[in-house]
């Protein structure tokens, strides 16, 4: 009798336990079905152009930090990763454009038409991005404000695609074929009609350069004021002072600042001073010649 009661209690306890679990199971099943349906609709199967495009990003065993790109089968997009410098696999590209053309079926190069009618890759309109690392590598980017390629200091990792190792590569990729835009805040290509020449009794106006107090043909970053930066170091650096047309020394704190920052005075002069000194030297020579000519004429008369 006692054993029978124990069996009855065990049976009803099991029934109660099952009844308490069933509602939770019923509530959970629709949610799982919904998740499955959403996932299938968002990520449809995609066949890349090459088998190696399905490989995972592999940085390799070396310790370099080289910005590269790979095709991500999950997101169906080309994404950035840091390559160690050796080994790895074929799913690795130097540029985002190369990755897209190689792996994405039906990919068409994205371009933006400018006011001049020229088409440029969309990454040419990205802002300068030095990345998150602390390197001091000279690179070039296209400045959409000045409409020309300019130098900047790249930290060595991440950043964006508006980043070129050479000035020529930047210009060929992003600049307009004919660039008649002013450099910096100083107009260098305006013309005004001031002279006239008579040919066959016809007066022909001759275009001459507009007079200006000071013309500067160098890079726009040479016009930026000296910026000591945000850190606490004290490094000797040089900047170009456009007011006096010379490179001057200043103390750099080690991080931040701007591109008007050179490790040696020679680098500063080479980058900024040579362009502005040409016109001033020509003007000085012309003035000296005029003075000497007047002096000779005066001596001959007397």
UniProtKB/Swiss-Prot annotation:
SMART domains: KU
Encoding gene per record: Tfpi
Residues of the site described as Reactive bond: 63-64, 134-135, 232-233
Job description of the protein: Inhibits factor X (X(a)) directly and, in a Xa-dependent way, inhibits VIIa/tissue factor activity, presumably by forming a quaternary Xa/LACI/VIIa/TF complex. It possesses an antithrombotic action and also the ability to associate with lipoproteins in plasma.
GO cellular component annotations of the record: caveola; cell surface; extracellular space
Sugar-modified residues: 144, 251, 261
Disulfide bridge partners, by residue number: 53-103, 62-86, 78-99, 124-174, 133-157, 149-170, 222-272, 231-255, 247-268
Signal peptide: 1-28
InterPro entries: Kunitz_BPTI, Kunitz_BPTI_sf, Prtase_inh_Kunz-CS, TFPI-like, TFPI/VKTCI-like
CDD domains with a match to the protein in the record: Kunitz_TFPI1_1-like, Kunitz_TFPI1_2-like, Kunitz_TFPI1_TFPI2_3-like
Naturally occurring in which organism (per UniProt): Rattus norvegicus (Rat)
Lineage summary: Eukaryota, Metazoa, Chordata, Craniata, Vertebrata
Tissue: Most abundant in heart, lung, kidney, and aortic endothelial cells.
Entry's Gene Ontology BP terms: blood coagulation; cellular response to interleukin-1; cellular response to lipopolysaccharide; cellular response to steroid hormone stimulus; negative regulation of blood coagulation; response to estradiol; response to lipopolysaccharide
All residue ranges annotated as the BPTI/Kunitz inhibitor domain in the record: 53-103, 124-174, 222-272
Main location: secreted
Domain remark from Swiss-Prot or TrEMBL: This inhibitor contains three inhibitory domains. The first domain interacts with VIIa and TF, the second one with Xa.
Keywords: Blood coagulation, Disulfide bond, Glycoprotein, Hemostasis, Protease inhibitor, Repeat, Secreted, Serine protease inhibitor, Signal
Keyword Cell membrane: no
Any GO molecular function: serine-type endopeptidase inhibitor activity
Keyword Signal: yes
Name of the protein in question: Tissue factor pathway inhibitor
Cellular location(s): Secreted
Residues spanning the membrane: none
Pfam families: Kunitz_BPTI
